[in-house]
Amino acid sequence: MSLLTEVETPTRNGWECKCDDSSDPLVIAASIIGILHLILWILDRLSFKCIYRRLKYGLKRGPSTEGVPESMREEYQQEQQNAVDVDDGHFVNIELE
C-alpha cells in the first residue's frame, strides 16, 4: 500500500489529480482540523495585541482595599499615580539634524 494519496497523471487536456482515498474519514478529519488550525492561527495573529495586552495589563488591579480607611485608599491611589507620572520621564526625545 502506498503512502501517497494523490497521483498526477498526464491526460489529453493537461495534468489532473486523481485522489483515490479522498472519501476516507481520516483524510476528511485531517483536512478539517488543518483548516480550523489555519483559521485559529490567523485570528490569533490578528488579535494578538488586543487580547494579550488586555490579559497582561487589564487584569492587574492591585491589592484589595477592603477594610482600609478611605484616607489610606486615597494616599495609595496618589502614590500609584505619582509612580505612573515618574515613569513618563524615562522616555528620551532624540532629535535628528
From Swiss-Prot:
Lipidation (S-palmitoyl cysteine): 50
Intravirion face of the membrane: 44-97
Residue ranges of the TM segments: 23-43
MF terms (GO), sorted A to Z: monoatomic ion channel activity; proton transmembrane transporter activity
Virion surface topological segments: 1-22
Subunit structure: Homotetramer; composed of two disulfide-linked dimers held together by non-covalent interactions. May interact with matrix protein 1.
Protein's name according to its UniProt entry: Matrix protein 2
Species annotation: Influenza A virus (strain A/Equine/Jillin/1/1989 H3N8)
Higher taxonomy: Viruses, Riboviria, Orthornavirae, Negarnaviricota, Polyploviricotina
